[in-house]
């Protein structure tokens, strides 16, 4: 039951983020996004900075990620980042080629398992069956 509510909330935020970023225009990078959107934030000029594994916020790419990456315990660019932060041993990169960073996992198999289960299609399917 909790996973259905979580999936519903994720889809709501992702949908809201798509509408907010499309209405604002290309010059502004604001709103909620999903790292699984292609391109994230509705334009390749913006970056989706995750605050959770499947949801984030849109920002201009100018230096924001470097500061956020250091502050967030699960964002990573390499396996070494995860080990240094103590958040895991494997940096699982998002399947979206527009996102150059990943999320720390305990192992490669855990990352593969998660990313194979979490896709926009699966989220929408789980919401429609609720």
UniProtKB/Swiss-Prot annotation:
The C-terminal glycine may be removed from PA1b. This is Albumin-1 F. Keywords: Disulfide bond, Knottin, Seed storage protein, Signal, Storage protein, Toxin. The presence of a 'disulfide through disulfide knot' structurally defines this protein as a knottin. It holds the Pfam family Albumin_I_a. The lineage of its organism: Eukaryota, Viridiplantae, Streptophyta, Embryophyta, Tracheophyta. Disulfide bonds join 29-46, 33-48, 41-58. GO terms for molecular function: nutrient reservoir activity; toxin activity. Residues 64-69, 123-130 form a propeptide. It comes from Pisum sativum (Garden pea). InterPro entries: Albumin_I, Albumin_I_a. Residues 1-26 form the signal peptide. PA1b binds to basic 7S globulin (BG) and stimulates its phosphorylation activity. Involved in the signal transduction system to regulate the growth and differentiation as a hormone peptide. Toxic to various insects through binding to a high affinity binding site in the insect gut.
